[in-house]
């Protein structure tokens, strides 16, 4: 390799140290005196001076090897220190005992130092024990869950319920529950968090045991340990499922050494001394320059030193690295020597100087070391660097994290090192995503947030309560000063975090560089391959938790990736005017169907990819010019058929036998919950003779298109970016897409991966972090209540005052802590910049969906997650970022709302989308969308034809699809217009706890008259739209209310039993749901009757009379069940069972009343008479049910007792805040009208013989005869029956026609055809 900046090329491959034949020639490189001075300057030390005999001779390259050997000679005591040590038993290399020292199911890393719990409570110990002296080891906490860390003896027996600390001779510290364990448990120590380091110390001279957390002693935990014959203590840990740690017994330098205690594994003292001496020589080379002309040595700063190809310098370095290279392959020496040297460079110099020196050092490593040596060295270096970054404590200026990131950047700026690390280390061996994570401090005191944010503040009225909260008070001057001081502290914190984030973005910019292709493939294309495999692990391994990257890492990685991506996108636009800005980014639709990007086994909108290829192959050929090979289709189909029948390969079956006897099982490294530096292979330890692992079937093979397609690993730059004859990723451009590319194709694939990342776990984590804000609100309410009680408490009650004062202090301290932690969360997760990232991702998805929709049937190839991300990212902006930052200030906010509304309105019933889950998500998103005024207005702004199409889909018959959400949408469009339907919370429910005012169900009514008008117009169009829709609504109402009555009968029977009994909470929930469905269906009927009354009252329509009779029948059934005093419904409501809070008289009775008022009061006189006659003709009609609405008592039946005079009666007049005076007057008018009409009907009615009654309903006289079978019934019954079934009700003969029938008439007249 030619060193950059060198004056000549020097290949170390052909270099060998001087031989005897060459000695004379070599010594003539420079003057003998100058060479002697130079070598003495490099290889001499006041501490390790050479012997006198050697010092009298001039130092040259002939005697330099002898001189170096003497320099590196180590005392015999240090050499022998690696042997057996008194007080310790076992191998000198200490690891976890994977052969027999464990219990339960565990995943152990390849280095046998990291472990992941894979069962309820697994335990494992080390291979080495101690019986005398003072010892310690460190545990790196990767997850903060339930774990017990400490010591045990070999006689301890554990199981999956009892672990370390649960037996007599085992001792443990549990930072999750902040306790210590030795059979019994007591409080001890502090809570730990992911990223902490626990030091476990044992003093067997004094018989004590203690722990440290991040180097701070937690005090003595146990005393009087059992010692003596047979008592030796092993490091041990018990951990629950998914929890993970990594041990350091001394194989690496201890992060927090303790004076007087030694690690279980001795450090390589002799090699450490040699490495430090060689490093001193190396540093001397970098600080000295030869001037052969003047014959003198010049001191020079390391940052200005350059390798200029001078033979003297090259030979000197060759001698150094001849001894140094083998040492730099050892983990301990890399971290203790090389890492310290490089960090010193970064800490002392400017970033530019540091990068220059590190670049020179890496050049020399690649030049003078064999490839395998420098690769091992770089691997260990990055592992140590990542470990240091992840497990460093948070300090106020984040200085430690900044230094580690600056060193990482300096290393990655070296092109050859960067490509090696990308290809082999960053994604394969260690978790490079950790570099982009900023951990949240659990203990704000240790993170220095008290100094950074000295003044705390929290809102006195929760922003989650909504802007209309009646408790909002005007801010006082003192509160204003506190808030401003708090905001200044938050701003200081944000600026410091932004420094770290900018360094993390620089790392990704280096990994996304595509101009460094001089020595092979550019970094960006290596990154793309590794990034896609990373996504595959997290998308395909959801059932295996250890395979998943923690979501908190994903959130940070996504934001840094978006920043780097947009930087390169806009940079490309600057040099290519025809490209687009990142603000206009989207994924072209051909990416989804041309097979160039692997989407693993992720679901497409139209179903399975193999199915889409078969059914849409003609469309692919005609629209995209892509031909699918029929043989490949056939083989893919056969693979799908045989998938469940394929036996496991032999090589996958053999490890299962080892597993059954508790042996190690190599696995593809999950490692996401364990040490950040694990090898790719793990060992699966199990004490049970069962297998929990099944071999995964290889992912689908690459599909043949018009040009060749390759697997992710085989792709080249040309396959991605394309060439003059190949469009690369954009193969198969549909005619709707522009010819000019948006940007570089590789950036499109990165963007696609970013969208997938959000769907995998980022959205879930964003919702989880809101919990800190909720905690602040709850404690603020508790503090406010306590202060109110203090003001009201009498001064003579000093005991109560003391308790309240104590509570006030506890709440204030907790709020101080939480407000500082909330500032950290807002700065790292919910900042304005992060909000803009999520908003940009939302707009990318919207444009992608819009462009995909234009391709017609090919839209089915789009992965489902694009629609999911569009829905979820909007939800995150509104619910998670909204309380902190205003959405209205986002650029193009109104336009984005409208575009999202158009997508939801069009695709919630799109036949191209077949997945049940995504269809439900679209329906729920639309239902939520119409609950909020600003988003409902956006729905009203979409083009008229789209609005009409949406309403038409909402009015489709309910039997053909899931209908509950559809009905909910229609109800929301009506809420605020119905009778007594202006409430947000039901009148009988009190606001007893803090609730999220952003919930859709708690929004104030915001009806849409525009969409109501579309509904009215559609119901009047065509003879079948209204009857089919209303028939389905009436059917579902009949079902829902019948189910509700049946369930409350069971609940009532259970409540009346004398023995103790419990009602299943799920049954109560289903019962309440059926009640809510009944109410919402009644409201839809009320809306329909109000908007289009002629559907029921214009009897020139063939179905109007039938629909009106069915409606009257159902209304009477509901009234009779609900209004009967001391009846079933009344008794269940009185019980006030938890889960049935929504079940009450008011919501269902006002819905029924609204329908009756519309039929009997508001319409024309002729229509009112028709409705009245039908209602009174129904045999279930009872006037007392109407009287009940206004609280008028029911006259007692003969033989029954009079009702209690003090019994509280239901009356609509009691709800003056919810029902207007005009509405009450209409109810009174309706009651008067029905009282008069029922009296007249009773006087005019004639007795009817039983033979003349309809044999179906026994309520109306026979008026129709069926042809050809001749059976008879009333018209209402047969018309209702024919709406759903064309067979005779009695004999199942197909009905051809229905004819009018009158008793005594000789002929019948055909009234309607079946």
UniProtKB/Swiss-Prot annotation:
Pfam families hit by this protein: SPRY, zf-C3HC4_3
Asymmetric dimethylarginine: residues bearing it: 683
Reactions this protein catalyses: S-ubiquitinyl-[E2 ubiquitin-conjugating enzyme]-L-cysteine + [acceptor protein]-L-lysine = [E2 ubiquitin-conjugating enzyme]-L-cysteine + N(6)-ubiquitinyl-[acceptor protein]-L-lysine
Subcellular location: Cytoplasm
Record carries keyword Transferase: yes
Reported biotechnological use: The WILVRLW sequence, which specifically recognizes and binds NFKB1 could be used to generate a tumor-suppressive PROTA.
InterPro entries for the chain: B30.2/SPRY, B30.2/SPRY_sf, ConA-like_dom_sf, RNF123/RSPRY1-like, SPRY_dom, SPRY_RNF123, Znf_RING, Znf_RING/FYVE/PHD
UniProt keyword terms in alphabetical order: Acetylation, Cytoplasm, Metal-binding, Methylation, Phosphoprotein, Transferase, Ubl conjugation, Ubl conjugation pathway, Zinc, Zinc-finger
Domain B30.2/SPRY: 74-254
A biological-process GO annotation: proteolysis involved in protein catabolic process
Phosphoserine: residues bearing it: 675
Protein name: E3 ubiquitin-protein ligase RNF123
